[in-house]
Amino acid sequence: MAPVSTVVKNAISDLAKISDGERLREALLSLKSYLGTGENSAQTQETTEFNRNHYTPVLEFLVAQIGPQWLDLLTSERLELWDSFFLEGPPDQAFLVLMDSLGKTGPSIRLDRCVHVLERFLQRGALAEVIWEVCQQQLESNPTSVLHEAILGRISSLPDHLANCLQQHNKPLFYPKNYYPRLAGSIIRVLQMVSDALRDGKNCSISFASQVVGKVCMQGRQKELLSVLVPRLKSLVQSDCIWQRICWRLLESVPDRWMEPVLTGIVQTAPGAEVLSQLLGDLVVKNKRTQFLLTKKMLFLQYGLKKDALQSILGYLSLDASRRHLLVKVLRELLEVWSSGSVVKHSPHPQLLHVSRCLLICLGLLNKQEIESCKQDLLVSLTSGARNYLDSSVPTTRRMGMVVAECLSHHIDTEGPGLSFQYEEDEDTRDLKALLKPPHMVETDSADFVKRPVESSPSKSPLSSPEVREKSKVKVKADQASDSDLDSDDDLVPYDMSADTELKKSKAPAYIRDCIEVLLSDDVEKLEVTMASLATLIQANTLATKEVSMELAKILLHIDEKPSVARFTELRHAALVAVTVTDPVTVSQYLTSEFYSLNYSLRQRMDILDVLSSAAQSLSEKPSHETSAESGSVNTDPHSIRSTAWTSSEVPVNWRKVVEERIASKTRRFAKGHSAATPVPAPNRYHAVAGHFFFPLIQNYDRQIVTFDLLGEDRLVLGRMVHTLGILMHLTLNAPIASQMGKALLEFVWVLRSHTDAFVRQGLLFCISTVLLSVPWEHLMTDMAEEVVETQCWLAEVAERDSDDDCRRLALNGLFLMEKLRSNIQGNP
């Protein structure tokens, strides 16, 4: 009998010359006999030699020959025979030949046939056979690692290869959303083969299956693969210890370079800590890479993870005694990071929220003995961390620090009073507090909460029995009979007293100087009445206010908080704004000078900034009390009212106006446009005094005094001042002084552009936008072209590299605004 190599060589030579369909069929059948699948199959030794040495060259020859000449000879039966070479031989070699042929072949009959065969190859589940074959080969003494790497690359990126080859003619089977779930099913089949082999006492290797999982996840397809793989593994490991060991080995064998995407996907997919513990086992203790990912990187850096994933990770650490020491270690590291001043200052808010969530989840999972061992760390972190968060200029960060500090103090001393802060609760604060309870406790509470209304519903109340309802009807009839005999007032409508106010014994002062005396006194009732009417009185008596404007502003700025006076802070702010609007030059000079003076609290300095911005806005608006003579406003002067109190017969009548009104009322109009009164022009009062508000405030910011350091610890006030300067700049639109103010503000921004506080940087970016909106583009490019170019470069850098989301957004807005202004100028030469 001729050797296999000779037979194969002769068959290939004949096939290359055949032009008859029947001879082609006979030649193919003679080659197929070596596959060992037909009736006339060759001996086992010959089949093994053919598969090892000749199978791949034969497939490559068949792919090369398929074309217009062979297509005329191949009927449907012969095409099926051609396909069987790929579908019935060694799957790993057939898969590689098909994938390589697709990459080398352009649009042609050959490409269509290869795609068709590959589609059938996947539909019959041959991927599982490919993976299993490679797993078996890895048990050999000299596995072909290069071949395995090639198969691994083709399996993990098959949708990308097919999309590049077929482009718009791609098949739905090759789409990622369809392929990777099918691949997950193939991996489950391979694991089932491993389970069966282990039960038969055979050796197995699943490292190649682990490599497939790792590489697919590394390419960003965790969701498609693990959404099928994790639920199937969850159901299998719960009932079988062999499956549990297979699952653990599957994840242990994932290469370290691909471990991160695999663990991240499993953490996000696994529904709870119990499932995660069943899938991973003690992998976090055995594998250093896994321990680093689960206890450091995911908890400190990957702040895109949701709170459910964090609860799964930390709950997984707490579910077994061999892992609980890692939970205590994580708590100490979280406390150190949370209390770090550098972290609070330089980290974005989402990352701080992420660390705070992890910290509170840890606290909720520790028992009393573990918390007792960490009490000193808790105390040190509380004392240093609370201060750093309270010093933050970002309100959300301050509020978050308050919540965590309250929880830490409660765990340090459960029986003591603990810390308590005043803050407005929002969704984040409520979520943080809820994290102290493990997930199963939260679910129980919510379930009870849902059940309570059902238990107390009217349908299940004892009052719904027929006897009780009958008794209640009799009682109602008796009550109605007794009430009918009485002369009651039940039908009277009660008087509406919702708008009533409490009568005050003290009257509101009529003069400004009287108000000053009341403000300096200790009479709380008079003070309340005076504060309620002070702003209105200032607006009505402008001349008298200007005489004592500085004294009044000084008293209002220094007056102590009066909790007994309703809306005291709001009324004081309104009065300060009113006196500043009445005498803007004098009061603004006083306030800006006092802003940098000694012995003022941060609250007073921020009050000054609020008053300056509110007063500037009021000055830039049209005065509400200025109306035209035709507006029909009522004169409230009592003398004028008495002098004009004529009888109806003495009132002079404008007969022309009466006639026009009668004609208008009798006239029927089918269409009438909107009649709008022509606005009365009025000067912008702020433009004339803008410099008195702006320049004194901007010139002394770098001067350090004993109790006030804007460039140091008082960055919250610096941020508020920067925003105030931006508001003052924005209100100078169309003002002659706008260019001068804009140049000074750009220089100010350039000095502070590298400030570490995100709130300050947000204010600086806001100032740039106000300069662009207030100063004409022509003046910007002529008077301060160099500053504008430097500012544009800085905006681009911030938009690309800044750690704060709001800063990046404001920088992009500034760049878009700058580009829009430039295009408007170029479009209108």
Curated annotation (Swiss-Prot):
Residues 456-466 have a biased composition (Low complexity). One of its GO terms (cellular component) is nucleus. The keyword Metal-binding does not apply. It comes from the Eukaryota. It is found in: Cytoplasm; Membrane; Nucleus; Chromosome, Telomere. Residues 629-641 have a biased composition (Polar residues). The keyword Manganese does not apply. Residues 482-493 have a biased composition (Acidic residues). Its main location: cytoplasm. Regulator of the DNA damage response (DDR). Part of the TTT complex that is required to stabilize protein levels of the phosphatidylinositol 3-kinase-related protein kinase (PIKK) family proteins. Promotes assembly, stabilizes and maintains the activity of TORC complexes, which regulate cell growth and survival in response to nutrient and hormonal signals. May be involved in telomere length regulation. PANTHER family: TELOMERE LENGTH REGULATION PROTEIN TEL2 FAMILY MEMBER, TELOMERE LENGTH REGULATION PROTEIN TEL2 HOMOLOG. Belongs to the TEL2 family. This is Telomere length regulation protein TEL2 homolog.
